[in-house]
């Protein structure tokens, strides 16, 4: 028969769920539910999230929470999962509280109308009694209800569940028993498989050596740990035999049996005591954990219950310093009034009034704060009105709702708050007469009407010396006087100013910004540079190769020799342009030349553009590419370089003269360079002669030091060799001397022994006297 899981939660199931959650966490609900035979993973998760979670608040609902709940229910209807984390309760708690508020409001309205007002059974049912389960009904949400108390006698299923949970939850270290058994079975199967394989190979004549030892470790199955092999050869065992005989004689079987029994009893007592201590320790530990958890829960509940609304108090109307100033001013006024009353002048006594009759004779009480609107009741009325309204398809007027200040509003997630403040008794219309409707009393001691005046500091006197209406009266009198002035004559005057002068003045008054001026100057400079680049020759614009040195005289002479005037002018202008480019834009590494003959006329830009246009038009009638190729081949086959055709017609004498002049110029440059070199050499000798001598002296010293160092190294190596040989010789000499000393000592001992023996023999011999013994 299948078991239907669910139902009311018991205290045992709650405790098992807490322990399993502490071990498995909040994500392994299948494992958690495996410890509870009557609950599913979904029910376990719901029980934890709805009741057992320590973060769940189970205290009474406050007014702020009710307002927030109704406000969020108005913004997000039926979205209890979204509302719950904002309110700080669970979704089920929010839903139950919402329904309870609606039921209570409905009961109040029913009781106010025709409800039951009796006592006991005659009274109307409460909201809790309406939702209470009747006999035979099943709770649809048992996870949100308190646990049922445990019975005295548990069922067999409960006992089995409790024992299994205790056994599984107690194993907090190591692997599980099933996993260990499975690993042992796998290891045994591997061992048997390897054994069967070795047997089959051995039957086939193949011996396989079993090597289970890892590198650097010992195989305790094959080797003997801490083995000490006896020394090879024969040795005497009489001592061991004697020791064995003594131990055999001293051995008493009864004593050994008694000692073994005592040792076993001691071990059993120790094991019994250890098990008892472990049991007591586990019980005490579990008890301590339970007590600690209870204390923590009480502390959390106390913290939650202690979170009350902040006490809102108004700011003080008068500070300590102002009170002291008021007291001092009152004392000064009393002294002045007393002096005036004691004066003999009647006018003085009449002018000084009495300021003691202030409206502060009665004790000031803090008035009661005005009654606030009940937001909860208004929101419940709105919700019930919306629920009871008819469909919008039927038409009609909208349902009247309590909006504005009387509701929580739609401003945000948090409901609208009504700021509570204590009324100011000094700013309230009181008994004394006031000039205006709803104004502050104008008698002494009242708050003044004009802004900037301090209450209780400048009270009004009885003679209207400081009347507030004086300023208003003077202003009205001034306006009347201005209105009485005669009207000006109707004369029209037309004034015209020159527009140019106004524009110039405006331009002068307006100062140009520095950045705008720099930008304008930069644009003008860039435009001038671009125009200057366009005025250059095509060779400079296209950066074409050009001669480094230009002989202007030779080019001008060649241009003058051309018979055609137009061609001569073109050649002359080309020569002038080449020379001008060489002077203004010299090639890299070439010193710019200076010539007074080069004077290029500045051509207008319009004329230059017209000339370029004519060149382009004439270039359209250029020769064919075949003719150009033929001319190029002819010039290429000529041995004379391009550009030197002008020198082909010169006479031989002129060429010789030119070459001689070039040779003389080269010789002069060589001579001048040699003279400059000699001068520089003398100057360097003069400046660096001392350094050269110093360097030569240092070079000699370095050579001498190097030679001395090499000699010292040779001497050092020789002495090292001598030291080594001396050490060897000293050792040999010491050995020889020791041998000689040993030989002398041995000979001396032998002589002493001989002397002693002879002396003893002489002492034992009879004394001979005159030849008789």
Curated annotation (Swiss-Prot):
Annotated stretches, region: Disordered: 114-191, 219-321, 338-372
Entry GO CC: cytosol; nucleolar peripheral inclusion body; post-mRNA release spliceosomal complex; Prp19 complex
One Pfam family linked to the record: Myb_Cef
Residue ranges of domain HTH myb-type in the record: 1-56, 57-106
Basic and acidic residues biased stretches: 129-151, 240-255
Keywords of the record: Coiled coil, Cytoplasm, DNA-binding, mRNA processing, mRNA splicing, Nucleus, Repeat, Spliceosome
DNA-binding region: 29-52, 80-102
Coiled coil: 156-203, 648-754
Superkingdom assignment: Eukaryota
InterPro entries registered for this protein in UniProt: CDC5L/Cef1, Cdc5p/Cef1_C, Homeodomain-like_sf, Myb_dom, SANT/Myb, SANT_CDC5L_II
Single Gene Ontology BP annotation: mRNA cis splicing, via spliceosome
GO molecular function, one term: DNA binding
Compartment annotation: Cytoplasm; Nucleus
Family: Belongs to the CEF1 family.
Name of this protein: Pre-mRNA-splicing factor CEF1
Organism of derivation: Pyricularia oryzae (strain 70-15 / ATCC MYA-4617 / FGSC 8958)
